[in-house]
Amino acid sequence: MKPVIALVGRPNVGKSTLFNRLTRSRDALVADLPGLTRDRHYGEGRVGERPYLVVDTGGFEPVAKDGILHEMARQTRQAVEEADVVVFIVDGRNGLAPQDKSIADYLRKTGRPIFLVVNKAEGMKYTAVATDFYELGLGDPRAISAAHGDGVTDMINEALEVAYAGQPEEADDNDPSRGIKIAIVGRPNVGKSTLVNALIGEDRVIAFDMPGTTRDSIYVDFERNGKKYTLIDTAGLRRRGKVFEAIEKFSVVKTLQSISDANVVILLLDAQQDISDQDAHIAGFVVEQGRALVIGVNKWDGLDDHARDRAKADLTRKLKFLDFAKSHYISAAKKTGIGALMRSVDDAYAAAMAKLPTPKLTRALIEAVEFQQPRRRGPVRPKLRYAHQGGQNPPLIVIHGNALDAVTETYKRYLENRFRETFSLTGTPLRIEFRSSNNPYADKG
């Protein structure tokens, strides 16, 4: 699984600035999705071919006893426990603060690799910036400027060397012999453990720990209707005898790792509860990761017709950026609707792995343009000439032509819908990339 880097520090030391710098390339993928809440504190970064998850823990007050500061401290401690590397950020402008010492005392006891980072160091000599912070006993401070990017690349490369050293080798994500890897995600008490047990049945369970990290993940292999699947543990499912029960602890880190590791994600919602920001955050990360998705609305049997209509309207309004995914209204406890849910899992995986021939893609593109041309931007109208597939899981369609920077987001969504309809790409995010032609004769004739 992707390693996790937790950003820790007292308020206003620049954690969010560093987070935004580390994750900006990923944020761009979901920036224009309507209905998506943007105030996330977790995301993906990438250096070369090495992806990683990064968690901004919020301002850390380790001695807070109650209220919102206590809750923030609890969440921070959990993130630190589950991180591969902790980046402890201090403020080079304001110098060493008593809170820094308290946080350092706590971090030393965790046993986690700690990178002490002095932020806001632009324009200052290293000795002037670093001297005070040696007192924390966390080794040599690394001076950076999150706002300007100075020192950030070197720091994150060092952190990733440590983080990846503890990661086990992973098998090919798309190896068909392993079966479809499914992550069932959702906030606490939506019925994840009930759905797991409904899917696997008590007599077909093979559970084993994958060693190699301090957070061993449980993978459960099972067959259903002759097809192989692997369930990935998400947020505290643990085997108790022959069934799985949910430990009452929601882990953002485990959820993000499971989404990243999966072929298909089942986002489980509680029909009897309004959709929350947390649901939207999880859904946004699924889209950002490009994972195939099926929505399960659980506890449907407990609603009357009026409540069902209200729940459907809530889903449409708050998660409209998931309109590519099928929704199923189920009861995990009564095992109703699960067959259709799993058929959509199969369909979503098939769509994510679909091979799209260049001639058919180009024909679909030409037909879409003939039906509705892109708008002009000033005197220029984009010319879309041909398309080919640039990747799978999720499908990437690369469109070639001229003046493609003038293509609007509205027209891009129009093309996406046309491709989805033509190739039955339900259940998977779809990426479209425009590449302007370098052919000097492209506009001739």
Curated annotation (Swiss-Prot):
CDD domains: EngA1, EngA2. Pfam families: KH_dom-like, MMR_HSR1. GO terms for biological process: ribosome biogenesis. Keywords: GTP-binding, Nucleotide-binding, Repeat, Ribosome biogenesis. GTP 2 binds at residues 186-193, 233-237, 298-301. GTP 1 binds at residues 9-16, 56-60, 119-122. Associates with the 50S ribosomal subunit. One of its GO terms (molecular function) is ATP hydrolysis activity. Residues 3-167, 180-353 form the EngA-type G domain. GTPase that plays an essential role in the late steps of ribosome biogenesis. Transmembrane segments: none annotated. This is GTPase Der. Residues 354-438 form the KH-like domain. SMART domains: AAA. Belongs to the TRAFAC class TrmE-Era-EngA-EngB-Septin-like GTPase superfamily. EngA (Der) GTPase family.
